[in-house]
């Protein structure tokens, strides 16, 4: 019984230090700079908004492939709102409005492609391919 409690305590202590580590921030709202552009508009706009980012616990089965794979959780929106910016200089007939999600709260869950990019971290952030303008959102 004593050994079981010791092992449990060590696991809890290790888990607590891992979770608090600055190298592995857990899933939470965080500020990020994004880029918005349209093929028809001459300017790319960069802006800062709140996204969900961070690590979620995951599990890999050790048993053979007889069991279905464990679902892998991603850091995704729990609650969100949508905001919009206007891309400047768009010609008549082109919709200049770019809408994007704003994280209000985050959680670890299945990826919802309707409002999340589930591709994982990128070597480079989304960059503008056109001249760009930085906007400050209120």
Swiss-Prot record:
GO BP terms: G protein-coupled receptor signaling pathway
InterPro entries: Cystine-knot_cytokine, Glyco_hormone_CN, Gonadotropin_bsu, Gonadotropin_bsu_CS
Predominant location: secreted
The UniProt record lists the keyword Disulfide bond: yes
Example GO molecular function: hormone activity
Highest taxon listed in the record's lineage: Eukaryota
Cysteines paired by S-S bonds: 27-75, 41-90, 44-128, 52-106, 56-108, 111-118
Compartments where located: Secreted
Annotated GO CC locations: cytoplasm; extracellular space
Record has Signal as a keyword: yes
Signal peptide positions on this chain: 1-19
Glycosylation sites: 31
Key words of the record: Disulfide bond, Glycoprotein, Hormone, Secreted, Signal
SUPFAM superfamilies: Cystine-knot cytokines (SSF57501)
Biological role stated in the UniProt entry: Promotes spermatogenesis and ovulation by stimulating the testes and ovaries to synthesize steroids.
Family named by the database record: Belongs to the glycoprotein hormones subunit beta family.
Oligomeric form and interacting partners: Heterodimer of a common alpha chain and a unique beta chain which confers biological specificity to thyrotropin, lutropin, follitropin and gonadotropin.
Name recorded for this polypeptide: Lutropin subunit beta
Source organism of the structure: Osphranter rufus
């Amino acid at each position: 019984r004593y050994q079981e409690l010791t092992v449990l305590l060590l696991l809890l202590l290790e888990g607590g230090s891992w979770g608090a580590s600055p190298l592995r921030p857990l899933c939470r709202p965080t500020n990020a700079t994004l880029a918005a552009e349209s093929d028809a508009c001459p300017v790319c706009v960069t802006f800062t908004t709140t996204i969900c980012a961070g690590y979620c616990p995951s599990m890999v089965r050790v048993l053979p492939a007889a069991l279905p794979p464990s679902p892998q959780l991603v850091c995704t929106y729990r609650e969100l709102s949508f905001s919009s910016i206007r891309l400047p200089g768009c010609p008549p007939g082109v919709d200049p409005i770019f809408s994007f999600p704003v994280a209000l709260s985050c959680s670890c869950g299945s990826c919802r492609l309707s409002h999340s990019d589930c591709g994982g971290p990128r070597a480079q952030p989304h960059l503008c391919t056109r001249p760009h303008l930085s906007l400050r959102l209120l």
